[in-house]
Amino acid sequence: MSLPTVAIVGRPNVGKSTIFNRIAGERISIVEDIPGVTRDRIYATGEWLTRKFNIIDTGGIELSDEPFMTEIRAQAEIAMTEADVIIAVVDGETGITDADEAVANILYRTDKPVILVVNKVDNPERRMEIFDFYSLGLGDPYPVSAVHGIGTGDVLDAIVQNLPNEIEEENENVIKFSLIGRPNVGKSSLINAILGEDRVIASPIAGTTRDAIDTHFVDSEDQEFVMIDTAGMRKSGKIYENTEKYSVMRAMRAIDRSDIVLMVINAEEGIREYDMRIAGFAHEAGKGILIVVNKWDTLEKDNDTMKNFELEIRTKFKFLDYAPIVYVSAKTGQRLNKLPDMIKEIHHAQNLRISSSVLNDVIMDAVAINPTPTDKGKRLKIFYATQVAIKPPTFVVFVNEEELMHFSYLRFLENQIRKAFVFEGTPVHLIARKRK
């Protein structure tokens, strides 16, 4: 189930990033930070009062070539498009500015909840000044001091009160997937090609609270698919459409809503940092992954072309050694007919359940091949293992001492499990737990 999203907006220097870090870093537990986005962390996942949500700092989306006012307007537009709840931040020291009013004027157009946060209210005397901010027309102002953590809990309470109701899990038999990649890798052509070959379009439906359009279709075997929209702002032509950080943010949202991610790479350009960042996020999120190398028809080939390209993929995507690779051409249709079946195979692997008896036979055979490690004369002892989750398949291995289970031995056990069962295309998680 995808998580609701909270976006932070406001002019520069009002403390958006400090509020983001305060919310994400102390008063809630971070479930997962995005790998590779430590320098410009704009997206985190957290929990408050048992509700999980994603939080976006639109201030991290820099549009540096644009005029000041255009930039902050764009960030407000992004929030209105992406978020379920919007936090509008203003500065309690400087008071209301033209830029604050510009943001407020844009937010008037949304029917999404807006929480007005007055930052830098560091002493009781300044609390009396927050009433001036009622003139923005954004509701009751929440006084906070992000630096000192004052008032953060009240803001989090307001966020949770305004989150959309949790919906029941969707039909597990429906396969949700998205095509992710840099601009110009050919995602649109691939989408059109996938939908154009003997597919029955069931219904284009509007996304839950956003304007994104997901596409439902069934294949010849009556398997239902949902292609998660990643275009999002097709209508826009707006200045932020091609900024890399905004592109990353949209990709992360699509990954969050997907079961399986088709990581699309341009054969002409190879793998870039963007690809590695997004692939890392999909991997950490436990999604099924299929690597799709598009525009394969454009390369001059010899006997080693495919082997060398695969070597590059496996070298740069070391953490995706389980992900299958397919070389396609949206233009010529080369190998496109393989995609639906490969997606279904990954979906099957994600949902595979292994009985404890069969699993423990594999574990004991693995220990016989490679005995458990020792540390300071004490040997790791494995009592038994059991599967506790699917999507991704997750196993708990009960041992005498968790500290004795080295990462390398867990990886060995994972490899033995992968040899015994078909888990191609999905991460497999192994967790060591001390038997009580």
Curated annotation (Swiss-Prot):
Indicate yes or no for the key word Repeat.
yes
Q: Which PROSITE patterns does this entry report, sorted A to Z?
A: G_ENGA
Q: Where does GTP 1 bind?
A: 10-17, 57-61, 119-122
Q: Which Pfam families match?
A: KH_dom-like, MMR_HSR1
Source superkingdom: Bacteria
Name the UniProt key words of this record, in alphabetical order.
GTP-binding, Nucleotide-binding, Repeat, Ribosome biogenesis
The record ties this protein, via CDD domains, to: EngA1 (cd01894), EngA2 (cd01895)
Q: From the UniProt record, give one GO term of the biological process aspect.
A: ribosome biogenesis
Start and end of every EngA-type G domain? 4-167, 175-351
GTP-binding in keyword set = yes
Which molecular function term from Gene Ontology is one that the record holds?
A: ribosome binding
Its annotated function is as follows: GTPase that plays an essential role in the late steps of ribosome biogenesis.
> How does it associate, per the subunit comment?
Associates with the 50S ribosomal subunit.
What is the protein's given name? Answer: GTPase Der
What is the taxonomic lineage of the source species? Answer: Bacteria, Bacillati, Bacillota, Bacilli, Lactobacillales
